[in-house]
Amino acid sequence: ATGKPLIISTGMASIAELDETVRAAREAGCKDLVLLKCTSTYPATPANSHVRTIPHLRELFGCEVGLSDHSMGVGVSVAAVALGATVVEKHFTLDRAAGGVDASFSLEPAEMASLVVETERAWQAMGHVQYGPTEAERKSLVYRRSLYVTADMAAGEAFTGDNLRAIRPGLGLPPNPEHWRDADVV
């Protein structure tokens, strides 16, 4: 073992073949392994890229997983990152018009820059499981709606659409009756 990372493309390999390959790499001392989900069609279409395989590979083999992307554009790579890909391999050319066997699905410099920006955005957007307002959202709580009495009411009078509204700011009772059904509001 060299101590260097090992990147293995999975193009057309069965789970049994991948298991044998990963096992051999680990038995040889590989500690830094990356499997690249690869579709061996050139160019690959988004429909035959099957990037949902990425989290499954990570679960099966307990290693980093990426994408060997032979599709046109950056969309498949962005989707792969959203599913947890940590490495993206993409063909590159200075000028697609110059030709070459992989020119049709290679990225030109501006497209490669877009790939970097958009995959970084996808990675950041993944975040973590979050419910309730984030720290950044706290200042927006005032824009939620609350129940407000909008007309003078007599004691015991029922709330109606004429005397009660759900309006901003959100500093009163929440408009969902589940939140105040048992409260003393009548």
Question: What are the residue ranges of the model-derived segments?
Answer:
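Catalytic cores and adjacent flexible loops of soluble metabolic enzymes
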Residues: 1-186
